[in-house]
Regions:
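Donor nucleotide-activated moiety binding/catalytic core segment of transferases
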Residues: 98-113, 270-313
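Conserved catalytic-core segment of nucleotide-activated headgroup transferases in glycan assembly
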Residues: 57-66, 197-278, 349, 382, ...
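Nucleotide-activated donor-dependent transferases that construct or modify glycoconjugates
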Residues: 29-53, 233
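C-terminal amphipathic helix plus adjacent low-complexity
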Residues: 1-3, 8, 36, 207, ...
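Catalytic binding pocket for nucleotide-activated donors in carbohydrate/polymer assembly enzymes
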Residues: 308-378
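A nucleotide-sugar donor-handling region in carbohydrate enzymes
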Residues: 8-11, 15-32, 140-152, 156-240, ...
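Active-site and donor-binding regions of nucleotide-sugar-utilizing enzymes
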Residues: 45-206
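A donor-sugar binding/catalytic signature common to diverse glycosyltransferases
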Residues: 115-137, 141-144, 291-334
């Protein structure tokens, strides 16, 4: 590792984990890849990875759930880093768990007919004939700058370009997102506007009710309470300063506006997982950072509060979404936006007082109209059938290249 990387690892208390990862990538992975080079591809095996081994969640989870619910003839394997897993991570019994960055993980990637990931793969053997790689990514609408549009390290860019060369299908949820991917993903292959697999659940009322009950039971939330979910994104500096919110005042505003009891759940971005215990939340606010599946939390929520993240998914509900951006100018300089933040249809506040005022003056009819117009301008493709479309891609690929699953 370079000196700067070592210093950052020590500062973030990840030195030993980073050192192990470096040893794996530079020494063990080449050896394991060589040993697995001539192993046969098993067309009915799908290997999933979510946020570099963070467990059962996001788009890969919902593709797997579709396979299970429809009893499709695939064997599924999940790459797991146990140190990164959180509450709600238990895999279904039909899915095999394999340690992330291990000989078994390289062997699985070498033999699986299908790879599914929602982030850049930081290691993978050379693809063989008959193998396909579906990159789902992990966003719905244009928000933050990503990939070539963002300020990224040379190491990341080098790895991202290598990853893009291996991708067979890159998924998109709308035409604006597709254009962004064409511009900045270092990818010349096929982009398929299937919709976002994780968003299918937002079109299923039974699953929404089931998820709300699951969250309420786990956190002992009264079933009649309404839920505000706070989903801030990460900052490059990993500071917690922008997350200081007047929770008590916000709850008072919600109760005045909607005449109901409210519970607040705060969930940090996965990049901030190691800082979750430093939040110092009031006793009446639930720390939901260790709940792995954001979609389940979104299903349970009645209002979302965010800054620069997760706004697209939740707005599919046409439920209220508020943006709290106390460091807006700093964030513009640090990360920037794919489109001007003012073009979003959601109320934006820079202070706690402004946020409380926006809640009290919220107009549902005007909000719904703005959000629907935003959908049209983005060319939204979400209709609750993204997972079905992904499985058709797999079936068509395997029929064309391999003569089917069997």
């Amino acid at each position: 590792m370079k000196l700067k990387t070592i210093i950052n690892s020590i500062k973030n208390k990840t030195f030993f984990d980073d050192a192990k990862a470096s040893i794996f990538i530079h020494f063990l992975f080449p050896l394991y890849s060589f040993l697995c080079k001539k192993m046969k591809v098993e067309k009915d095996k799908i290997v999933f990875s979510n946020y570099y081994g963070r467990g059962y969640g996001d788009n890969p989870k919902y593709i797997a759930e579709y396979i299970i619910e429809n009893k499709l003839p695939y064997r599924m394997v999940w790459l797991i880093d146990n140190k990164k897993c959180k509450a709600g991570d238990a895999l279904p019994k039909c899915i095999v768990s394999v340690p992330y960055r291990s000989y078994k993980s390289v062997k699985t990637l070498s033999t699986a007919g299908v790879w599914v990931d929602n982030c850049r793969k930081d290691f993978f053997p050379k693809k063989k004939d008959g193998q396909m790689y579906i990159q789902t990514w992990h966003g719905t609408f244009l928000t933050k700058k990503i990939e070539a549009d963002a300020d990224l390290s040379e190491r990341y860019i080098r790895n991202a370009k290598k990853d893009s060369e291996a991708i067979d299908y890159l998924l998109s949820s709308n035409t604006e997102r597709t254009q962004q991917m064409k511009r900045c993903f270092w990818y010349d292959g096929e982009i398929v506007e299937t919709g976002c697999p994780r968003d299918d659940v937002l079109f299923d009322k039974n699953k929404i009710i089931k998820n709300k009950n699951k969250i309420c039971d786990f956190y002992s939330i009264p079933k009649n309470n309404k839920i505000l979910l706070y989903l801030p994104t990460f900052r490059n500096s990993h500071t917690l300063e922008p997350y200081k919110i007047d929770y008590s005042g916000i709850i008072d505003s919600l109760e005045k506006k909607f005449s109901e009891k409210w519970t607040v759940i705060t969930r940090l971005h996965p990049e901030m997982l190691s800082f979750a215990d430093k939040l110092n939340l009031p006793h009446f606010v639930i720390n939901g950072t260790f709940w792995n599946d954001t979609q389940e939390l979104l299903s349970a929520a009645d209002i979302i509060l965010t800054d620069y993240s997760s706004m697209g998914d939740y707005s599919l509900y046409l439920k209220p979404l508020f943006m709290y951006c106390p460091d807006l100018e700093d964030y513009k300089k640090e990360r920037g936006f794919a489109i001007p933040i003012e073009s979003y249809p959601f109320p934006i506040s820079k202070t706690n007082e402004e946020l409380k005022e926006k809640i009290l003056n919220f107009n549902r009819e005007e909000y719904n109209k703005k959000v629907e117009e935003y959908y049209k301008s983005q060319g939204l493709k979400e209709d609750g059938t993204a997972c079905e479309k992904v499985l058709k891609l797999i079936e068509e690929f395997q029929t064309k290249r391999c003569g089917g699953i069997k």
